Structure formats: structure tokens, C-alpha cells
């Protein structure tokens, strides 16, 4: 089997990708048997290509799966941990903008009774 390109895989459906993955795994097992029995050098060099092709297929499957999950959870209140933005622990625990802007009754009263004074400087 020739080297597989990821862009060719992206257009395929999941069933097709899984079938191709099975074919590649069968081919890899045959190549490994040929390696043990003393197969040709062309077959031995093909092992690497097949392994990388399997990795490409799995990568495309996982990426499309994650993309679909992102679409599903878009706009929802709760998301799985792996779909949330990766921040530091401190940043995740920080107050959000709304919580930061909240003021106590006492603070609101003080600001209302004693507004900020504006001074004009005479030139």
C-alpha cells in the first residue's frame, strides 16, 4: 500500500477510516511475519510506512471526533475537561469579570454619597 496522505483521509467517513485502519493493521501483521521468516528487504522497509499510515488514520479519527464534540458542546454551560481552555491553575480559580465588578451595598452607598471630585486647572 502506498503512503497515505492526511488530506485524503479527512474527506472520508468514520466507517471507511475504520475499515482502512483494519486493512493497515492486517498488512502490518503480515509484514512482521515476513520479517521473522526472512522476507525481502522491500517488505522490511514497508513496515515503517504502514506504521506511520496507521498513526495518520488514528490521528484523523481522533481529530474529527474532538471537532464534533466541540460543535456539540458549543454554547453549553458545562463542557468536558479536555474541551475547556488550558489555563494555569491560578487562572482557572481567578474571579470572572462579572464577579470582579460586583460591589457591596456599603461600597455602592459610599460611591453615591461621595462621588469623585473633578478639578479644573487654570492655565
UniProtKB/Swiss-Prot annotation:
The role this protein plays is: Component of the large ribosomal subunit. The ribosome is a large ribonucleoprotein complex responsible for the synthesis of proteins in the cell.
Name assigned to this protein: Large ribosomal subunit protein uL29
Family under the similarity heading: Belongs to the universal ribosomal protein uL29 family.
Any one biological process term the GO annotation gives? translation
* Complex and partners: Component of the large ribosomal subunit.
Q: Pinpoint the Glycyl lysine isopeptide (Lys-Gly) (interchain with G-Cter in SUMO2) cross-link.
A: 25
Stretches of Basic residues bias are at 86-96
CDD domains assigned: Ribosomal_L29_HIP
Q: Which UniProt keywords apply?
A: Acetylation, Cytoplasm, Isopeptide bond, Phosphoprotein, Ribonucleoprotein, Ribosomal protein, Ubl conjugation
**What's the domain of life for this entry?**
Eukaryota
Q: Which residues carry this modification: N6-acetyllysine?
A: 19, 43
Disordered, as annotated region: 85-123
Subcellular location(s): the record lists: Cytoplasm
GO CC terms in record: cytosolic large ribosomal subunit
Question: InterPro entries annotated for this entry?
Answer: Ribosomal_uL29, Ribosomal_uL29_CS, Ribosomal_uL29_euk, Ribosomal_uL29_sf
Please give the residue positions where the record annotates the modification Phosphoserine: 29
Q: Which PROSITE patterns match?
A: RIBOSOMAL_L29
Molecular function per GO: mRNA binding; structural constituent of ribosome
Q: Does the keyword Transcription regulation apply?
A: no
